[in-house]
From Swiss-Prot:
The lineage of its organism: Bacteria, Pseudomonadati, Pseudomonadota, Gammaproteobacteria, Alteromonadales. It catalyses: urea + 2 H2O + H(+) = hydrogencarbonate + 2 NH4(+). Belongs to the urease beta subunit family. GO terms for cellular component: urease complex. It is found in: Cytoplasm. GO terms for biological process: urea catabolic process. Its main location: cytoplasm. This is Urease subunit beta. The keyword Cytoplasm applies. Keywords: Cytoplasm, Hydrolase. Its EC number is 3.5.1.5. Pathway: Nitrogen metabolism; urea degradation; CO(2) and NH(3) from urea (urease route): step 1/1. Heterotrimer of UreA (gamma), UreB (beta) and UreC (alpha) subunits. Three heterotrimers associate to form the active enzyme.
Length: 105
């Protein structure tokens, strides 16, 4: 098994992950001098300060990639990423400690 792999009955057809959740697409640049890697469930609002982007709209969002995967930003690299909203109780704890509680709607 591959991390993030989903094995389903082929008779079900194609399954879209995170269907119906709010999504947000943005451009992100690594302005630092070292690579930065962001995991699938890391609160994007709280990622490394050397990733340059408008943070406010990313509050309550994570990368829209399979569980266990990550996106790597090389120094000087810009790339477009898609984010997906956290679901459930929408309580953010830990990470960089910038939120520590329920995300306001």
């Amino acid at each position: 098994m591959i991390p993030g792999e989903i094995i389903v009955n082929k008779a079900l057809g194609e399954i879209e992950l995170n269907q119906g959740y709010d999504k947000y697409t943005l451009s992100v640049a690594n302005i630092g001098d070292r690579p930065i890697q962001v995991g699938s469930h890391y609160h994007f609002y709280e990622v490394n300060e050397f990733l340059s982007f408008d943070r406010e709209p990313t509050l309550g969002f994570r990368l829209d990639i399979p569980a266990g995967m990550a996106v790597r930003f090389e120094p000087g690299q810009s790339r477009t990423v898609e984010l997906v909203a956290y679901s459930g109780k929408r309580i953010i704890q830990g990470f960089d400690g910038k939120v520590m509680g329920k995300i306001k709607e």
